[in-house]
Amino acid sequence: MDHGGAREWMVVDAAEHMEIGPALARKYDFLIIEDDPYYFLQFEKPWAPTFLSMDVDGRVIRTDSFSKILSSGLRIGFLTGPKPLIDRVILHIQVSTMHTSTFTQIMISQLLQQWGETGFLEHIDRVVEFYRTQRDAMLIAADKWLKDLAEWYPPAAGMFLWIKIKGVSDTQQLIMEKALQKEVLLVPGGAFNINSSEPSSYVRASFSLCSPAQMNLAFKRLADLIKEAL
């Protein structure tokens, strides 16, 4: 759900049809694992509903991440769901990875206790505003350099812009060889296919750390490479 335009389509569709998920789970007797690490990075309110919010008979296990909203170095997330299912997950963790770093767990626990719910949501608002500003800067750079060379939709959440390169059937060589030589770091769309060897005309650009000047320079270089490829 972090792929720019792809995610935007999913949000619109989900708002109208997400209730189908729990209904199908009930009809065919299966569980839903809702993996949504960018949920708290939605740029517009009200936020899209979750499967968990619609769960009435304990069929949804939801996973969230503190890494996206506090610090990536923490490498810690949390599960929400029916207690019997969560208890089984805990038993599995105890005989596999043990658990996430105790130190980082204590840090986050103390921080959340100090903030409370209000402080946590205020922090989320600040994080969202930061990424919204970053997103807008990347959209400006994309519109300046890639308008006639690629297609994209403004992402509704997250920290990535999903771009389709016109006239390029596979971006693997363009991104992993030519772009790298120009010090432009992007991810070719094929990396997100079930079969990563399948060709893809898409690339993913991150706006999490780059400055507007870096975004502008990167897309200028990408535009030059696309023109050469065409």
Pin down the residues of each PLM region:
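PLP-dependent class I/II
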Residues: 1-230
